[in-house]
């Protein structure tokens, strides 16, 4: 609310201000691509000086559309940015990532993998990339979140898609009220609604 309050103070209308998390912009970026990119699960590897994060998008078809789940795993304990400073560290990091991918692909069908962040400026992950590109598309880019934020304003286009991730409510939240002798559900928050906009 601090960010939206600041922009309101600067004269922007409240309904024109949208605060999005990295995860939300990542999902928006994936959804704006061709469906073949997100035909199956989609993985994002993000590394900066402080952390190495893996986010997986999975989806499930439901009666009224599509539910997208984003699961996040912190891999900083396995590979750190400091490992990439030496040749032997880069080789070790590639072996660790390759092992992680091989294990993950036993349970997930992944159609696309994205790499972003300063940790992926150099191509230290050659063996891992070869494994990924065997049956999947792979992209490396440094402006994925900015592009995702730009297209996220088109989220109305995806009104039949429910996105469940960190920063969004996972369930409908409501109360039962009595109105004219009948019980009715009064919705307070919908599943997939951003906490920052609640």
Predicted regions span which residues?
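Phosphate/ATP-binding catalytic cores across multiple sugar-kinase/actin-like superfamilies
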Residues: 26-34, 91-109, 152
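Short glycine-rich, Thr/Ser-proximal phosphate-binding strand/loop in the N-terminal lobe
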Residues: 56-91
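A short acidic Gly-Thr/Ser loop motif
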Residues: 36-53, 57-60, 117-120, 164-171, ...
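Glycine-rich phosphate-binding loops at beta-strand->alpha-helix junctions
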Residues: 1, 100-130, 137, 141-142
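Acidic, glycine/GT-rich loop-and beta-edge segments that sit at the periphery of enzyme/chaperone cores
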Residues: 144, 150-198
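Nucleotide/phosphate-binding catalytic cleft detector across ATP-hydrolyzing
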Residues: 1-47, 57, 95, 133-134, ...
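Conserved beta-strand -> loop -> alpha-helix junction used to position metal-binding or nucleic-acid-contacting
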Residues: 12-27, 69-77, 137-151
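Phosphate/oxyanion-binding active-site loops and adjacent basic polyanion-contact surfaces
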Residues: 1, 19-22, 85-97, 141-146
């Amino acid at each position: 609310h601090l960010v939206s309050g600041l922009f309101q103070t600067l004269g922007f209308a409240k309904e024109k201000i949208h605060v999005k998390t990295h995860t939300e912009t990542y999902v928006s970026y994936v959804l704006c691509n061709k469906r073949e990119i997100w035909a199956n699960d989609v993985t994002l590897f993000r590394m900066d000086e402080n952390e190495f994060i893996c986010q997986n998008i999975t989806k499930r078809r439901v009666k009224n559309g599509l539910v997208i789940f984003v699961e996040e795993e912190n891999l900083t304990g396995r590979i750190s940015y400091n490992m990439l400073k030496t040749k032997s560290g880069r080789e070790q990091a590639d072996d660790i990532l390759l092992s992680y991918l091989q294990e993950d692909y036993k349970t997930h069908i992944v159609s696309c993998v994205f790499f972003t962040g300063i940790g992926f400026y150099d191509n230290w992950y050659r063996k891992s990339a070869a494994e990924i590109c065997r049956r999947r598309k792979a992209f490396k880019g440094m402006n994925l979140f900015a592009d995702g934020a730009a297209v996220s304003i088109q989220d109305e286009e995806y009104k039949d898609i429910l996105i469940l991730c960190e920063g969004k409510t996972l369930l409908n939240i409501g109360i039962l009220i009595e109105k004219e002798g009948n019980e009715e559900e009064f919705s307070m928050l919908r599943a997939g609604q951003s906490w920052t906009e609640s």
